[in-house]
């Protein structure tokens, strides 16, 4: 055993992270990292992707007074900076002609502006590709740690998006090759497969991807606690929904999915 990670006490109050009357004129956060790498104390390594916070900052940066309706608009914003940045990176790394299925997803996604509205087909394509990338990049290595290790990793939504960023930014290339095959896969190979797999996934679960919109596949049901009782649920359903839901975990309008 080691005492390295034993409890050492509380962070001194005057060394706690804070922001007081910043020059930008406002304080905002979207559960994203609030400290720099030089901060001497451990607070957390499980920060939200910076996407939500970035879009909130974009909106608040405008030199204008905000009323209640303006703030409602900020909180309901459905633009994803993560999508804006990485959709073109995904499409640039896809080889057109790889497969008819992959090409169809490519055509849905190219030119997307990152707005995750309920009538957007590109949002469907982006999230399908993103989730297949997570699977194709990490499942092979994590498999060696046990059959449920990937499921545990997948459930950590903040970590998976930050990991994707690092891989496409060239900081974590060891994850790219599929260690379960004899070939040496490149990132281009993994992206090609992920575009193809995204089409297969959507087709099997929902139907023709070209006919899908974000509001059809991304929905919310507001569940009543009494619905947990099977007898009560048989008699009456107190839950309401499902309703189409714009946005995602990457937008100020927080709408993560499982």
Where are these regions (language model features)?
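Active-site acid/base region of carbohydrate-active enzymes
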Residues: 104
């Amino acid at each position: 055993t080691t005492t390295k990670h034993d409890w050492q006490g509380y962070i001194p109050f005057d060394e706690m992270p804070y922001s007081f009357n910043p020059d930008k004129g406002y304080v905002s956060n979207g559960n994203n990292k609030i400290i720099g790498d030089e901060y001497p104390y451990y607070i957390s390594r499980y920060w939200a992707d910076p996407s939500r916070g970035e879009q909130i900052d974009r909106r608040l940066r405008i030199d204008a007074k905000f009323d209640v309706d303006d703030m409602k608009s900020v909180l309901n914003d459905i633009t994803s900076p993560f999508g804006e940045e990485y959709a073109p990176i995904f499409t640039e790394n896809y080889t057109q002609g790889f497969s008819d299925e992959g090409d169809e997803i490519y055509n849905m996604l190219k030119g997307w502006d990152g707005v995750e509205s309920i009538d957007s087909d590109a949002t469907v394509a982006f999230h399908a590709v993103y989730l297949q990338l997570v699977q194709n990049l990490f499942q092979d290595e994590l498999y060696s740690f046990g059959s449920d290790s990937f499921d545990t990793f997948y459930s950590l939504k903040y970590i998976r998006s930050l990991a994707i960023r690092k891989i496409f930014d060239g900081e974590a290339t060891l994850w790219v090759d599929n260690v379960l095959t004899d070939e040496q896969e490149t990132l281009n190979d993994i992206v090609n497969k992920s575009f193809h797999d995204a089409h297969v996934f959507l087709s099997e679960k929902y139907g023709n991807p070209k006919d899908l919109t974000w509001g059809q596949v991304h929905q919310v049901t507001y569940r009543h606690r009494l619905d947990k009782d099977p007898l009560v649920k048989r008699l009456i359903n107190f839950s309401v929904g499902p309703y189409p839901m714009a946005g995602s975990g990457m937008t100020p309008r927080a709408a993560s999915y499982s």
